[in-house]
């Protein structure tokens, strides 16, 4: 498996980013994780030309991406658990436990994927034998500490099972 990483340096798609994605798909890329707001428009446009796939971000973007570029283009979306976050913070406010003025890193709070502050979309197209139950088991193992995921942003992660090609900035 090969992962290519490039930074779009903006939160909207444009001709330059679409051209970059066209090149990736033409050279064998199967799925683009379009992380950056509306930048999914460039990934979706390029994917639609060749039958590629897209992973959305922030919320379940399947309706937007598939609606604009074709049914089934969206594989999943890496979601911020906005409902879980809002509910947790409003509960803290009503219980007098809200601590304003600080930055928090929110993640897993339990084994239930829908209760967590990070999730994948309900519209996820599970494939290759990986099921929603497998996803739930994976979340449970992460919450239990059996599987760890680094949140370090100061260095590229060490990887052994994949090749990572860091391509810098598009813009």
List each model region and its residues.
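A residue-level marker of the well-folded mature domains of exported/periplasmic proteins
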Residues: 1-171
């Amino acid at each position: 498996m090969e992962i290519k990483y490039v930074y779009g340096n903006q939160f909207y798609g444009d001709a330059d980013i679409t051209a970059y994605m066209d090149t990736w798909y033409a050279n064998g890329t199967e799925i683009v994780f379009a992380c950056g707001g509306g930048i999914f428009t460039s990934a979706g446009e390029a994917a639609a030309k060749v039958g590629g796939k897209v992973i959305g971000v922030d919320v379940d973007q399947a309706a937007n991406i598939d609606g604009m570029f074709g049914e089934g283009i969206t594989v999943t979306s890496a979601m911020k658990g906005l409902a879980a976050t809002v509910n947790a913070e409003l509960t803290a406010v009503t219980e007098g436990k809200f601590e304003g003025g600080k930055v928090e890193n929110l993640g897993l709070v339990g084994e239930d994927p829908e209760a967590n502050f990070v999730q994948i979309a309900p519209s996820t197209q599970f494939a290759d034998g990986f099921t929603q139950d497998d996803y739930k088991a994976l979340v449970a193992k992460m919450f239990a500490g059996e599987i760890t995921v680094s949140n370090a942003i100061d260095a590229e992660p060490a990887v052994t099972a994949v090749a990572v090609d860091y391509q810098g900035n598009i813009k």
